[in-house]
Amino acid sequence: MMSRFGIGALALAALAVPLAAFAAGEEPAAAPMLTEEQVTKGRQMFQDNGCNACHTLADANAAGTVGPSFDGNANLDKGHAVQVITSGQGPMPSFGWLGDEDIDLIATYVVQVKK
């Protein structure tokens, strides 16, 4: 049986690698590249769900000014995009009803095509 010290040391070791990566300023893992068919579907979903009314994204011919522009947004990463699409943030409503697969596709699309 492992002592409390051993369990604590094991837990600390498990956190060390991710924390070291964070402290070193490493970038989050890149979103996987979409096929042309997936890009087309992502673009269509972006437009059909009204994302283009608030956000700027050249690939989707979107010039909204209410929400942040995705073009040239170096801080936009897939994980954050999934979180905001799912739960909403500020004036943006939640789109959690879309389901995980569709949310993942939209987030990956936006991150992949931003200029």
Where are these regions (language model features)?
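Bacterial N-terminal signal peptides that target proteins for export
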Residues: 1-10
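Electrostatic cytochrome c docking/interface patches
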Residues: 24-46
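Gly/Gly-Pro-rich "capping" loops immediately C-terminal to redox-active cysteine motifs
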Residues: 39-43, 47, 53-87, 97
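C-terminal capping alpha-helices of c-type cytochrome domains
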Residues: 97-115
